[in-house]
Amino acid sequence: EDPFSLVPSKDTDGHGTFLAGLAAGTAFPLQNFTGAAPMADLAIVKLKPAKKYLRDYYLIPEETVAFQENDIMMGIKYLRVTADRFRRPLVILLGLGTNYGSHTGTSPLSQVTQNYGGFFGIATVIAAGNETGLAHHYAGRFSADTSFEDVELRVGEEEGKRGFILELWSSAADLYTV
């Protein structure tokens, strides 16, 4: 049987297939592997790539996989509606990362996942990332008597060819000089 006759698209990078295996993979005792819930039913959302104007704005390279936050939220809504229709509990697994945003839980997507996680029978699982030690983030805190802090930003040669995006997050009264 051709598995691709059952679905309208293919997972070309393997990330979704890998996550599905972690979530509900069959037990392979000889390889010491079992998915978290091997008997689970899966409902999968295939996200479309981010629109060109957003990729251009954020200088996202053509070969980089990127999605839009609003599409992710619509996918979550679809899963919620599907779980309701079948009267099933739902675990929403998001294995999508970003280096953008404040990471404070205040983005629209963060709010949606937090809200759905408050419903009975729904759990949200969000990957913590796999870029430890790559120095994509800097956090600093200033005391009242600190007037400035120099922070060096190193941009790789390839990234610098097109430009780069830098986000600065602070309280409203703070000032930055760049």
Q: Which residues does each PLM region occupy?
A:
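Generic recognition of flexible, low-complexity loop/linker segments
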Residues: 7-9, 30-33, 82, 112-113, ...
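Short beta-strands within extracellular/lumenal beta-sheet-rich domains
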Residues: 4, 145-153
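Subtilisin-like serine protease catalytic core
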Residues: 1-68, 87-88, 121, 161-162, ...
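Substrate-binding/access-modulating region of protease and related hydrolase catalytic domains
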Residues: 51-142, 146-148, 160-175
